A protein has these predicted regions:
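Short alpha-helical Gxxx[C/S/T] motif in the catalytic ATP-binding
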Residues: 100, 105, 109
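Glycine-rich G1-box
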Residues: 1, 74-75
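Glycine-rich ATP-binding loops of the HATPase_c
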Residues: 117-123
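Disordered, acidic interdomain junction associated with two-component signaling
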Residues: 11-13, 56-63, 79, 133-164
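Conserved catalytic submotifs in the C-terminal HATPase_c
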Residues: 4, 9-20, 56
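Short helix-loop "hinge" at the ATP-lid/N-box region of the Bergerat-fold HATPase_c
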Residues: 40-41
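Short conserved segment of the HATPase_c
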Residues: 76-90
Length: 168
């Protein structure tokens, strides 16, 4: 497989024990994974990028999940890791020149993970790659609460009222 025109294998490993329906924020999770996978792609010339999602524990009506993005990219030194989650900062100045980016992706991802009650962490070895990982707890959703529509025609000639309590 080629990702970004390079020989990179994408491996997706999802624990089959994870319930099909969970309540969480798919938009935030998508943003986190987009940022982490884009970074892994940016800093991996060849090798692999692995996305792992594992069920850690069932706590009543909640499920604790661990998420990780692991790459075989350039990795980072311990000094570079110290500044990794600072806004507008990349590992060093040459990174911005060579790979581009604003230095905000990881800061945003860290904030989103924290909003969901988790902590974004990283392990990295220079020249070998990096692993970004976090654990969050999501609520089990009732199967009844999630309708399965047979087709879009179900909504034909229907009116929809959308109410949002978000203040802007």
């Amino acid at each position: 497989m080629r990702i970004a025109g390079r020989p990179i294998e994408l491996i997706v490993d999802v624990d089959p024990e994870i319930p099909e329906v969970l309540m969480g924020d798919p938009l935030r999770l998508s943003q986190i994974f987009t940022n982490l996978i884009n970074n892994a792609t940016k800093f991996t010339e060849s090798g692999s990028i692995t996305l792992k999602i594992k069920q850690e524990q069932v706590l009543g009506n909640n499920v604790k999940l661990s998420f990780s993005v692991i790459d075989t990219g350039i990795g980072m030194t311990s000094e570079q890791l110290q500044h990794l989650f600072n806004a507008f900062t990349q590992a060093d100045g040459s990174i911005t020149r060579k790979y581009g980016g604003t230095g905000l992706g990881l800061v945003i991802s860290k904030s989103l993970v924290e909003l969901m009650g988790g902590e974004l962490r990283v392990e990295s070895e220079y020249g070998k790659g990096s692993k970004f990982f976090f654990t969050i707890t999501l609520a089990l959703a009732s199967q009844v609460a999630v309708p399965k529509w047979k087709s879009v025609s179900t909504f034909k000639n229907k009116n929809v009222l959308l109410v949002d309590d978000c203040e802007r």
